[in-house]
From Swiss-Prot:
Top-level division of the source organism's lineage: Eukaryota
Major location (coarse): membrane
Name listed for the protein in its UniProt record: Leucine-rich repeat-containing protein 3
LRRNT domain sequence ranges: 39-70
Repeat positions for LRR: 71-92, 95-116, 120-141
Residue ranges occupied by any LRRCT domain in the UniProt entry: 151-204
PROSITE patterns hit by this protein: LRR
Record family assignment: Belongs to the LRRC3 family.
Subcellular location: Membrane
Membrane-spanning segments: 211-231
Keywords: Leucine-rich repeat, Membrane, Repeat, Signal, Transmembrane, Transmembrane helix
Length: 266
């Protein structure tokens, strides 16, 4: 069964035969007056086992539709122009099992992007996007089979920690490659192949951090030493000038002789 875009669809409600007539009438009025969802205007909706499949592929969408059917079980958003998955983008979709966001222009995935669907989601396709990295929290407690292939990944510690926890699609796992890397020699290689060889990007990260701290501390130490040297030399110069000034003053014996000469003349 399919529904036109923008149509309201009512849920099937089970009413026990033993219920009073007034209760059954009241429940019927509520169901008629409060629609369970509306199919987005840019999408096409159909029914699957009393739940809703929302087809929004190739609709020139630039963002995820905000008012999706509450009972959506499958959401197809491939081949659009979506650039970001914001926090709680699917929070009102507790039945969501299939999510296809492939072939978009996604660059950013917020930390709470999949909050609310982490338990229900079974498949997640993020292939063929523009993602270079994702926060660790974005896929927390996510049990879905995930496709991340054909993205320009930057291989570093955070990505390594993310991939270690994910259930990657085995058919596309070798297409998850390092586009760039903290270690240039790994660029262009499959991430899993690099990690399975024993490479630990987190070690590189810590070493880089240690080197940066050492350089910073060395710079401060050099500045302190330079200041001490300047201070000592400046004081020495002041002392030298003061000594020369004292030497330029007439001595007490010379003053005494000059005084005697003046007295004799007088």
């Amino acid at each position: 069964m399919t529904f036109p875009a923008g149509a309201y669809v009512l849920r099937k409600v089970f009413i026990p035969h033993g219920c009073p007539l007034i209760f059954r009438l009241l429940l019927a009025v509520i169901c008629l007056s409060v629609p369970s969802f509306a199919c987005p205007k840019s999408c096409h909706c159909s029914e699957r086992n009393s739940l809703t499949v929302v087809q929004c592929s190739s609709r020139n969408l630039e963002e995820i539709p905000p008012d999706l059917p509450h009972d959506t079980v499958s959401l197809q958003l491939s081949s659009n122009h979506i650039t970001k998955i914001p926090n709680q983008a699917f929070k009102n979709l507790p039945w969501l099992q299939e999510l296809d966001l492939s072939r978009n222009a996604i660059e950013t995935v917020d930390a709470g992007a999949f909050k609310g669907v982490s338990e229900s989601l079974r498949t997640l396709d993020l292939s063929h996007n523009h993602m270079q990295g994702v926060p660790k929290e974005a896929f927390a407690r996510l049990h879905a089979k995930i496709s991340l292939s054909n993205n320009p990944w930057h291989c570093e510690c955070t990505l390594q920690e993310v991939l270690r926890e994910l259930r990657l699609d085995p058919e596309t796992v070798n297409e998850v490659s390092c586009h760039t890397s903290d270690q240039e020699k790994y660029a262009g290689k499959p991430v899993i192949q690099v990690l399975d060889s024993g490479i630990n990007f987190c070690n590189f990260h810590h070493k880089t951090t240690d080197v940066a701290m050492f350089v910073t501390m060395f710079g401060w130490f050099t500045m302190v030493i330079a200041y001490v040297i300047y201070y000592v030399r400046h004081n020495q110069e002041d002392a030298r000038r003061h000594l020369e000034y004292l030497k330029s003053l007439p001595s007490s014996s010379q003053i005494s002789k000059d005084f005697d000469t003046i007295s004799t003349v007088l």
